[in-house]
């Protein structure tokens, strides 16, 4: 089966709306509060739903309804769509990559200095049709260039999900899924493995300090400040047009 669990306190009802990718029909399943923690809502659906898109329907005490993507989703729809996606279990094995990473980490960079090549995947290179390279195509295009130019490391601007193609990726909407612009999580794992195979260190930018204000994501998740700062004067990050996390809450920092 398929289980859904969501932390969302101070609301009246929660449901999960799941869309079948074959016929695009949506089914709505009501969630129940956890018997030991009323801030957590859950439901178990007795069949597999790999590939289904889904979002949560949250009802406030005043009857207002709104929809949210899953903060912990492992995959997302391709923009401009915003639903989360139930991803298949990964078939990728890290055993060989772990050994190769240790060899990279054990290098003495006093003898061979680090040379880091930083890039944004979406603007580094495009396909002949003007589209984005996927992670596998990036591996075949970028790694030979890095080796030829003598760089020791690649640093990639944020690869977590974000709404705008024009963005560098610093306005995050989901922290547990690589953006679907460039392929699947297994495609990304392939790229990481190829870097390790070629003894190239890899740095992935990750932005835990602030998050996107888009209404389908973390902002005002239960109708009020939940993931963001409750104190209005500390909530907004005007330099980025984002919201700051409330690090006073254990559920947020965990």
Model region roles, listed by residue range:
Residues 1, 25, 35-118, 123-130, ...:
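The feature marks proteins involved in alpha-glucan
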Residues 7-13:
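Short proline/glycine-enriched turn/loop motifs at strand-loop junctions of beta-rich domains
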Residues 12, 27, 39, 52, ...:
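Residues that flank catalytic or metal-binding motifs in active/ligand-binding sites
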Residues 16-20:
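Conserved aromatic beta-strand anchor motif in extracellular beta-sandwich/beta-rich domains
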Residues 29-31:
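Surface-exposed extracellular loop regions of Gram-negative outer-membrane beta-barrel proteins
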Residues 102-111, 120-254:
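Substrate-binding/active-site clefts of carbohydrate-active enzymes
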